[in-house]
């Protein structure tokens, strides 16, 4: 599982805490 609380790449829609994958 990958958890992000930031925008990893410009243009992606990640702006919050996102969890995905194993």
Swiss-Prot record:
Induction: By light. It comes from the Eukaryota. Keywords: Chloroplast, Membrane, Photosynthesis, Photosystem II, Plastid, Thylakoid. This is Oxygen-evolving enhancer protein 2. May be involved in the regulation of photosystem II. Belongs to the PsbP family. Signal peptide: none annotated. GO terms for biological process: photosynthesis. The lineage of its organism: Eukaryota, Viridiplantae, Streptophyta, Embryophyta, Bryophyta. It is found in: Plastid, Chloroplast thylakoid membrane.
